[in-house]
């Protein structure tokens, strides 16, 4: 969650309150698939709930994508969230964000609030097709973010290993309603480019363990949030239960907890 949306350690205070109710043991630095395996958890506990989110990000599919100055929006938002002082963070002067979801909006607005001179959010389709809510789109523009629709990234420009700009091709829909490039190119200067074109389930989380059924890049669950593995439930962004929003993840957790209770009582 972007730092400007939840101030004063709101989420941490919520966690602290719940943990203090008692009967909860917290183990940190235990990465699923590395320090701890799903198969081992299934042997040790009657029920396992996976709320692992989507830890990987989609690639732009461009050459030199590993250039300095080309970052994952999700990773950057996480770093900002954990930073003790946002005032000490450096931010680029000219920033281009690629994507049309709430994550793209978050990093664009956050960059502007941190002092970036020029922030442009780009999306390959129109505003109606953006997964970001209309409220979020309007908020970005009132925050000083420029939004450019109907452009798709084609190539990155660099100097001495650092991104200096990005080439876009204008897009349109063909008579069948499919997206296509028009051949018209546009160049945008940038010293920072953020990728926000969707997240993926991280394969390594199931390393060395039986893998639950996965469809469309997400863990498959039934109406009770049960996975294909006995004794394993899942919820949040890692399953397709609705919108990829915090409130949806919280609701998934509540419903899964009730399901686990019914199964074990």
Which residues does each predicted region cover?
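Generic beta-strand/beta-sheet core signal
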Residues: 29, 50-52, 73, 98-100, ...
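FAD-site-proximal beta/loop scaffold in flavoenzymes
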Residues: 66-92, 176-243
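Long hydrophobic segments that form regular secondary structure
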Residues: 91-125, 178-181, 186-192, 225, ...
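Glycine-rich dinucleotide-binding loop and its adjacent helix/turn
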Residues: 7, 16-31, 57-114, 214-228
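Short amphipathic alpha-helical segments
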Residues: 60-64, 108-110, 133-134, 205-209, ...
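Rossmann-like dinucleotide-binding cores of NAD(P)H-dependent redox enzymes
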Residues: 1-17, 26-28, 108-155
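Feature captures the FAD/FMN-dependent oxidoreductase FAD-binding
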Residues: 12-63, 155-167, 192-194, 199-202
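A conserved FAD-binding loop/helix module that cradles the flavin
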Residues: 107, 238-265
